[in-house]
Amino acid sequence: MRKGIQPALEQYLVTAGGGEGAAVVAAAAAASMDKRALLASPGFAAAAAAAAAPGAYIQILTTNTSTTSCSSSLQSGAVAAGPLLPSAPGAEQTAGSLLYTTPHGPSSRAGLLQQPPALGRGGSGGGGGPPAKRRLELGESGHQYLSDGLKTPKGKGRAALRSPDSPKTPKSPSEKTRYDTSLGLLTKKFIQLLSQSPDGVLDLNKAAEVLKVQKRRIYDITNVLEGIHLIKKKSKNNVQWMGCSLSEDGGMLAQCQGLSKEVTELSQEEKKLDELIQSCTLDLKLLTEDSENQRLAYVTYQDIRKISGLKDQTVIVVKAPPETRLEVPDSIESLQIHLASTQGPIEVYLCPEETETHSPMKTNNQDHNGNIPKPASKDLASTNSGHSDCSVSMGNLSPLASPANLLQQTEDQIPSNLEGPFVNLLPPLLQEDYLLSLGEEEGISDLFDAYDLEKLPLVEDFMCS
């Protein structure tokens, strides 16, 4: 204790639970009192016995006048821990068991030991620090360390003060949930207000009143929408919608759903077409690689003319190497075809219609000698009147090509027998014009004209003249 400073008098008040008990008032010098006098005093023991009820405790408020701590077990099994307390003069000293622990107890206070503030700046051991609080637990529980119902709560706020034994109270219907106050729901309501405006302009003050929210929450929505260019600030506290039409929201949704359904159907149809293309490609590959099919890999004139879709139409067959480019300009008056190839020559064939079942050749009767008589056509007779006649043998002529031979054909396609006669290029000659043979009574002189040799002039006459 500092010199020149009188020791501070300390006054203690012990109150039992329920307002009943005994009061012990002790006034003494802190330096000259016994260290364990208060706990062993009869008045303190009587107060402790009166406060020994379930959930009762005694709290002692002292100044840090001593650095030595002691504890004494009371009749109820409670623990007192704290600095040494001064006691009344003449108090008996009793030895008690010492135990240092952090006390636990119920929230209701049954006993209170208060100390008035010190009269001086400090005590004998002095530091002048804040008063220390110690609580004495006087419950009936035999365990003097921990209580399951009074563990340190892990929650925050109001949940920490609630006892775990008490059931959770259900929320009242009037209490709003977290979703009701969320910014997402508030944004939907704000968009609905914008859609109800005829020109898309909304007053923020009116929106805050209708939605019953603070204006700063409205600003949270408008800042985001303005950042993504969906609204713009028209004037003070007025914003205008810049997105798509909100009045046709239902129609746009139906249109989007219809487009999605159409895209799904087109995707399925495209998938079927891909499968068909793969199947046809595989079949074509098998047909082309087969040796038996390669021998018959051609198209005939009759095959083309048998197609019903090509009836009464002009058919042009094009035989071209791979990578040949075919262009057909879009012309209404005339039809043009442009062919271009860098791999080889291009062959084009015209497939006319056959008017007769047989080859288009004229039929003429032959005589008994096998000669073809002169045709009855006046045009041919007039045009060929200056030519000499001759007889034509059937066996010396080769067959002419028919329209079926316009396409390149294999040997098995060429007809072996021609039912119709051939076309005569010139009118046949009569037998009188040429002697094909001599009779038995004729000689070589009969091949020449007969002349009278006596009438011939002499050679001398030719020389003189």
Swiss-Prot record:
Gene Ontology cellular-component terms listed: chromatin; cytosol; intracellular membrane-bounded organelle; nucleoplasm; nucleus; RNA polymerase II transcription regulator complex
Transactivation: annotated segments: 391-465
Residue ranges of the region described as Dimerization: 246-337
Cellular compartments annotated: Nucleus
Entry annotated with the keyword GTP-binding: no
CDD domains with a match to the protein in the record: E2F_DD
Family: Belongs to the E2F/DP family.
Biased composition (Low complexity): 163-172
Region called Disordered, residue ranges: 96-179, 357-389
Sorted UniProt keywords: Activator, Cell cycle, DNA-binding, Nucleus, Transcription, Transcription regulation
Subunit architecture: Component of the DRTF1/E2F transcription factor complex. Binds cooperatively with TFDP1/Dp-1 to E2F sites. Interacts with retinoblastoma protein RB1 and related proteins (such as RBL1) that inhibit the E2F transactivation domain. Binds EAPP.
SMART domains (alphabetical): E2F_TDP
Molecular function, one GO term: protein dimerization activity
Region called Retinoblastoma protein binding, residue ranges: 432-449
Compositional bias of kind Gly residues: 120-130
Keyword DNA-binding: yes
Ranges spanned by the short sequence motif DEF box, renumbered to the chain: 209-245
Domain of life from the UniProt record: Eukaryota
Organism of origin: Homo sapiens
Cited function: Transcription activator that binds DNA cooperatively with DP proteins through the E2 recognition site, 5'-TTTC[CG]CGC-3' found in the promoter region of a number of genes whose products are involved in cell cycle regulation or in DNA replication. The DRTF1/E2F complex functions in the control of cell-cycle progression from G1 to S phase. E2F3 binds specifically to RB1 in a cell-cycle dependent manner. Inhibits adipogenesis, probably through the repression of CEBPA binding to its target gene promoters.
Residue stretches of biased makeup (Polar residues): 358-369, 380-389
Region Cyclin A/CDK2 binding, annotated ranges: 101-153
The protein's name in its UniProt record: Transcription factor E2F3
Region called Leucine-zipper, residue ranges: 204-225
The entry's DNA-binding region: 155-245
